[in-house]
Amino acid sequence: MQEFVEFSSNNAFLVSGLFASALAVIFFELRIKTRNISSLSAPLAVQLINSGATVVDIRDADKFSVGHIGSARNILEAELLKNPENVTKKNKQALLICDTGARSAECATRLRKNGIDNIFSLKGGIAAWQEQNLPVVSD
């Protein structure tokens, strides 16, 4: 314990940064949970896709053409928010995908406020999908 106190006093900025980072992670995780957003890990997203969910990639067309999930439709976020009925029919689930999962989670929040309940976001976005070595296709 004495070594920890000595290390902390000698590296106050490092320890402060560590605590600030930990608090930020906790804050953002709680924020996502309180928004009632269902962010799915890549393996759970695969199960959702296999059950027939609509997959919507909200990234721009250039990024979409470089690599996307095979069954994904490319609909920009602004268009999706204007015409949410394009996402899914009643009682059908939809999975939103972006680069990191942040924009798709925010978009899912807005869509839920518009009454679309069966909407999910890919946690970590396409980057998390590729980290799991799951397939992507390019145009």
PLM regions: where:
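Structural scaffold elements adjacent to functional motifs in cytosolic proteins
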Residues: V55-D57
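Rhodanese-like catalytic fold shared by cysteine-dependent sulfurtransferases
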Residues: M1-S39, P43, L48-S51, A61-Q93, ...
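Short, surface-exposed ligand- or partner-binding patches at beta-edge/loop junctions that are enriched
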Residues: I97
